[in-house]
Amino acid sequence: MTHTALPVATVVFGPEAAVATGHALVLAPVTPSWDEGAFFAPVIEVLAGAGLRVTVADTLSLWDETVDSMAVFTARWRELLPGFGPVDLLCGNALGGAVAQALLPEAGPATAALLVSGPTRTDALLEARLGEIADLAASGRPGEALALLNRRVLPSGSASERDAGPTPDADEAAGRRLAAGMRLLRGIDLSPAVLGHPGPLLQLVGERSQLVTRRHTAAAPHHEVHVVPGTGMRPHFEQAAHVSALIRAFLREKGLQ
């Protein structure tokens, strides 16, 4: 595991560039602090196992108080993208998935995309649920915000959702990240970037997700959206074997293994 010198928190997994079969760039979801790729561990294992060099980036590293929209935020990522070098597979989870979709026009026509619970567009219900988390975080209650987020990422109606544990610890910095990340997703519609992408794309969403669902995605005829049975926002953990098999098949089909 290595780190890059880019002005964003990153960690790199997999073989050295000289022997890798390709390069995957993974953009992180909203997390209370940078977890160095733990959020995507099962997928990283699959990608690295297929011979890809995997760079995982903390998406919110490029956020500050002057960023007030997804357009401004993705403009920053657009400027940074060339610094990662050639990207064969652009990946993103949740907020990172949204940013990855916004970057598709800059990624190149042959670049493959792998998205997990990455919204292409929002609607009133999704924005209300994200806004509730953001408002708690912004009002000095980051622990409550994180507890609500932890419930919302679970499958709807699950026992663990009904029997939530104690409010987790979260400091002011975590609250700023939570509020910023949730609010960046307000009013987005990245459909033109997705529908216009000529490369392959696989989007995975949970059948019982309380947040990002099939209706929040877009896909061209040559793309694939797969709804993972029984899962919430983290199908790659909840149905790891099933999701890993889908990703391996996608990599083989697209010549990335």
Locate the predicted segments by residue.
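Flexible "cap/lid" loop of the alpha/beta hydrolase fold
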Residues: 105-140, 177-180
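Gly/Ala-rich beta-loop-alpha elbow adjacent to hydrolase catalytic centers
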Residues: 91-100
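Catalytic histidine-centered segment of alpha/beta-hydrolase-like enzymes
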Residues: 231-244
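Conserved alpha/beta-hydrolase "acid-adjacent" motif
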Residues: 205-206, 210-216
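Conserved HGGG/HGGXW glycine-rich cap/lid loop of the alpha/beta-hydrolase fold
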Residues: 2-66
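Short beta-strand/loop motif that positions the catalytic acidic residue
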Residues: 196-197, 203-205
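Conserved alpha/beta-hydrolase catalytic His-Asp/Glu region
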Residues: 124-126, 142-193
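Conserved acidic catalytic loop of the alpha/beta-hydrolase fold
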Residues: 48, 70-88
